[in-house]
Amino acid sequence: MKIIVGGGISGLWLAAELKARNIPCCVIEKSALGQGQTLASQGMIHGGTKYALDGLLTKAASEIGAMPARWKHALKGEGTVDLSRVQLEREDQLLWSVESIAANLLGFFASKAMRSRMERIDPESEAAFDHPNFNGHLYRLSEPVLKLDTLVHAFAEILDGQVFQAEVTQLLTQDDKVVGVETSAGQFHGDVILTAGEGIEMLLSGLAGSYPVMQRRPLAMAVCKLTQPIPKVFGHQLGSGSKPKLTVSTHEFDGAQYLYLGGQLAEDGVTQDDDTVCANAKRALSEALSWLEPKVESIHIFRINRAEPSTREGNRPDTAFVSKLNNLIVAWPTKLALAPALADQVLQLLDEESKSATLPQWPKAPEGHYPWV
């Protein structure tokens, strides 16, 4: 039995891959499926274009480049993981500027390396940019945006009867090997795979020996409730730096429209208090979409940690991370889009021999909700 600790996207995708191969497995989640970093994300399955905004196709951009196609394959119901029930917010994302773009960057965007990832489009083709006061550049990225609650629901259906709610309090060991988990619902024995994001650190701290070190890269996301709706926007505003100045996704809850803001705004907001981030968010939004004149009723800040394997300078890891020490597998996807790549790496480390196993009689893990609403 493969015991997957953590019911975020990495654990869910991995479990679906195991189930498709008839490898007995279960997912143990302490709160609700997707409740951590998964539902806190903006649902954008990007292929690394935003990592190439300095005019260089970096390792990170190359590694993640195949992921949109992999996800689209699953969203069509093809391959081992059938996500055809997942709803899309959009089939693509937008990249825009409200100021001039450096000539070298324009040339890079038009290069052969980037043509398969993006195309420049007429603003008239997009409702949010079809306005005489928009004078910038507009690109379409062939990278889907998912309605994340439907993604979690699809996995809950695929894995019905295999996802359990319990808090793993420690790892059970015997002869220096991990042989199972101690949970709030009882003990369970099997091969353990940790995909618990930020929760991995505590579980590893109880083990003897050397294990991967975790880092946290926090974000201060801004949630803007509008007084009246604007055309939906899903994409990234170009700035002068190597990261998107602002990343915008649009959501509707209880008849109200919300803009969920990330990008450089959320990076900078980590060291700022909420009032400062709110003021900066309002200003950034009015600059990024000035022609739409978005009217903000209220703003609140949602802070979230990105849990990842430690890097030398605390920077973003380029790829999904999987490590096997003795018989324990530790995994961080590092990005929502990289969940399939993480599953591929884990599968290479497993003994895929199918063995019968009895599942625990524990409560079913509920589906999570957007934590920032």
Residue ranges and their predicted role:
Residues 1-27:
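N-terminal Rossmann-like FAD-binding beta1-loop-alpha1 element of flavoenzymes
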Residues 43-128:
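Dinucleotide-binding Rossmann-like beta1-alpha1 core, especially the glycine-rich loop
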Residues 122-159, 264, 325-333:
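Helix-loop-beta segment of a Rossmann-like dinucleotide-binding subdomain
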Residues 289-373:
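C-terminal catalytic lobe of FAD-dependent flavoproteins
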